[in-house]
Each structure stands twice: as structure tokens, then as C-alpha cells.
């Protein structure tokens, strides 16, 4: 069994795409509308794990997804921190280095979902 994707219901597709596609760097694998009310975007590599963004005009989503955190690995934590700051995204916590081989920080996505950015050495 393989993990395929995680689904995030978003309040603003444009803001979420800017965050996950432009800033985090996930590729748009697929994008389509479902009727007049919904839009779905699959982000990630063709054969890899994906992030599915779903926007529904009629759906009220909570201001924050409690107890959910998504992690992304980067080659340089310093560059990732600069990228966040240059895009006016506040560093919520960190950088943290519990052991010498790993360091990370946390930000929130546009809907308040906690996103961990990690560098493994």
C-alpha cells in the first residue's frame, strides 16, 4: 500500500496555489473544475505523493485545521526561511534542531494549517 495524497479543503484557491505551488515549489500535476462550485488542484510529482487542494464556493471551512501538520524537505533551511520572509510569511516557530542531523521551522498556510520545513543533513 502506498500513500497517495492528502486532501486540504481551502478557503481561497488563489492564495493556496501561491503558497503551495509558487513558494513551496510543488508542481501542478492536474487542475480541473467540478461543476460550477468546486475546483480541484493536485500538486506534486506525477508518480509521487500529492497535495490535493479542494475549493468549494459553498463550503465553510474552519479557520484552522486542528492537529494537522504537513512537512516538506528542503536542501537549505536558510534559503527556505529567506523565501518565507520575502513572501511575508511569518516563521511561527524555529529554527529548531533537536539533533545535529536535522533542523526545521514552522509556518502556517493561508488557512492556518501548520507546515513544517525541514533540512536533513
Language-model-detected regions and their locations in the chain:
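Core segments of cupin and vicinal oxygen chelate
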Residues: 8-50
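Short, charged/polar surface micro-motifs in flexible loops or helix N-caps
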Residues: 46-50, 58, 77-79
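Short amphipathic alpha-helices within nucleic acid-binding modules
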Residues: 19, 78-83
